[in-house]
Amino acid sequence: NVLEMVNYLKKIHQKPIEIIGLSAPGLANETNSCIAHLPNRLHGLENFIWEQYFETKTFVINDAHAALMAEAKFGAIKGYKNAILITLGTGVGGGILINGELYQGLSQMAGHIGHISISHNDDERSILGIPGSLEYALGNYSIERRSAGRFKSTYELIKTFKENDPFAQWLWLDSVRKLGISLASFINVFSPEIIVLSGGITLAGDLLFEPLNVFIDMYEFRPKGKITKIEKAHFDDLSGAIGAAAFAMNKTISSI
């Protein structure tokens, strides 16, 4: 388990482990010491004080926020002050970097980009009850419903898209168009230097990024001709661990 892993690292490490960073789905509390809200997942871990469990100073961070920190410290966002990272997988999440700092907001929930509405007339709702959410339009969890049972995963959709299937092409491009509208809207509000996309859906490669850039060109406000970069994340599976460690280091340094 996690404690055994930490104790093993303490044993083999030449120096004492002074801080631990932990990423998880859900929302951290105001001091980033525990998971305050973890809907429908890992019951029993809400408000669990990890520092007492590990007997080591521990900082907890949302997994999408951790992915942002990983990219900001070591990856595609390194060197940028204002950026947005969006995770595209089972659902849609994200994180926001403002003036070089992770923006968490009032309830540590900033960046839940999937829960914006892009079609208020849509009967389908997100897990928060939001009609026409971006998460429903793009998330892997909804693909079976969006395709009327034809596709079990986004991977199947993309595979059929490559076979020039008309329905698959319409469904995929409609989803990408909605993502493009959303990204253009974020650009118009935040004016970031770069937006980084991560998660399994980005494995579509050019089938995602080429039409996405076309749609963003249609909707982004560019009064000075400056264009926000759209790039793929450098890290995938390890982004949570890397970002949580970076966040813990930043919190420790800022408290000195």
Set out the residue ranges of the language-model regions.
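Short glycine-rich anion-binding loops that position phosphate/pyrophosphate groups of nucleotides
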Residues: 25-28, 89-91, 201
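Short, hydrophobic alpha-helical segments
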Residues: 10, 248-256
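Adenine-nucleotide phosphate-binding core of ATP-dependent small-molecule kinases
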Residues: 1-18, 131-137, 142-213, 228-240
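Glycine-rich phosphate-binding loop and adjoining helix at the ATP-binding site
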Residues: 3, 7, 15-20, 26-82, ...
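Charged, glycine-enriched surface loops/patches
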Residues: 214-231, 242, 248
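Glycine/GP-enriched mid-protein hinge/lid loop-to-helix segment characteristic of carbohydrate kinases
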Residues: 59, 73-174
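Short glycine-rich, Thr/Ser-proximal phosphate-binding strand/loop in the N-terminal lobe
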Residues: 1, 34-37, 107-109, 118
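Active-site glycine-centered loops adjacent to acidic/histidine catalytic or metal-binding residues
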Residues: 63, 89, 244
